[in-house]
């Protein structure tokens, strides 16, 4: 189905719908986002530059009829200069407003704005490595930084005493809470907001010092304030998951005043590319 969906570009062209021109800020169809899950769920999100009910419904109806495998068909009207949709309303045309991913009997709700690794099979391997490196016995307080939809937090929760997850995107945190409830997990807490504003010394004093910190920041790495708070917290172990070796090396250098690297394991999340998670 993936090549066919990508081939839907021809359908758009045949209908004479203009693609969005970023430089001139004109056109109609901006982007087509596809998310798949190991459960068979399939999400498609079409982003338009402006509303045109007749054209929009014709295109969405075509996708719904041509690809009945789609379980979540949604759209966004984004009239901004940039392509980000995190601050835009996502509307459901057909099906659910999410897909379900599954691993080790746990189910994870993933919405259109929620971060989740694109390679489900390798994501499972990555999370197993993170759990192994965390060395949990069931008695630890764990902080999961940049938790996304709470996948790692919920994944390790059965081996921890308590897990606190922090994430910038509010919708992702709502999904994280739903994921805990969905799996009857009661030892997790989640907070939404800028990491440097939430993870403070006061936060540590209020919630307790973490025995283990698992951090999976974006490509930009961690803010200096976040690193300083981690150094203040002095967890026994830090598991650093990164998609950018350069910023990871920078952050590890800053953490080296109190910590040293004991293990490194790369995970090939994007086969046949130069990208790797470590």
Task: Spell out what each predicted region is.
Residues 1-7, 12:
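Single conserved hydrophobic/aromatic residue that forms the stacking wall/gate
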Residues 16-22:
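Active-site phosphate-binding and catalytic loops of NTP-dependent enzymes
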Residues 22-23, 29-31, 266-269:
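Short, solvent-exposed loop/turn elements at beta->coil junctions and helix N-caps
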Residues 27-29, 39, 275:
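Short Gly/Ser/Thr- and Asp/Glu-enriched loop/turn motifs at secondary-structure junctions
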Residues 31-33, 100:
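Short, surface-exposed charged micro-motifs
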Residues 34, 40-49, 107-111:
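Short, aliphatic-rich beta-strand segments
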Residues 52-58:
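Short, conserved charged micro-motifs
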Residues 55, 63-65, 69-278:
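Rossmann-like S-adenosyl-L-methionine
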